Amino acid sequence: MAKKSKIAKNEKRKEIVARYAERRAELKAIIRNPNTSDEDRLDAQFELNSQPRDAAAVRVRNRDSHDGRPRGYLRKFGLSRVRMREMAHRGELPGVRKSSW
C-alpha cells in the first residue's frame, strides 16, 4: 500500500496536467513550427518554462487503482501485476483465464 500522501500528490498532478494541457499543446506547436518567427518561438519557450513543473504529463505516475502501487503497473487492467494475479485467481477479472498449453 502506497502512502496516502503520494497517491494524493499524484492525483493533484493529474488535475494540474489537465488544466494546462491545451495551452501546453498550443505552445509546443508554435515552438515546433518552422515558419514561426524567432521572437514568437522565444516567447513561447519562456511561457512554457514559466508553467509549473507538474503541468508536464511525464510527471504523472501510473499507479494501481486499488492500493496505489507504483511499480509493475499493467495499463490494460489499471492494476499492478500482484493485484492482477490475485484478482485473476479469484475470478474477478472477466475474460482472464489461467493459461495452459
Swiss-Prot record:
Record keywords, A-Z: Ribonucleoprotein, Ribosomal protein, RNA-binding, rRNA-binding
Nuclease as a keyword of this entry, yes or no, is: no
Spell out the residue ranges making up region: Disordered: 53-72
- Keyword Ribonucleoprotein present in the record's keywords: the answer is yes
Q: Where is the composition biased (Basic and acidic residues)?
A: 61-70
- Record-linked Gene3D superfamilies: 1.10.287.1480
Task: Give the matching SUPFAM superfamilies.
Answer: Glucocorticoid receptor-like (DNA-binding domain)
Q: Which is a GO BP term held by this UniProt record?
A: translation
Any one Gene Ontology molecular-function term assigned to this protein's record: structural constituent of ribosome
What GO CC annotations are associated with the protein?
Answer: small ribosomal subunit
Q: Which purpose does this protein serve, as stated in its record?
A: Binds 16S rRNA, required for the assembly of 30S particles and may also be responsible for determining the conformation of the 16S rRNA at the A site.
Q: Which HAMAP family match?
A: Ribosomal_uS14_1
Give the protein family: Belongs to the universal ribosomal protein uS14 family.
Task: State the oligomer form and interacting partners.
Answer: Part of the 30S ribosomal subunit. Contacts proteins S3 and S10.
The name this protein carries in UniProt is Small ribosomal subunit protein uS14
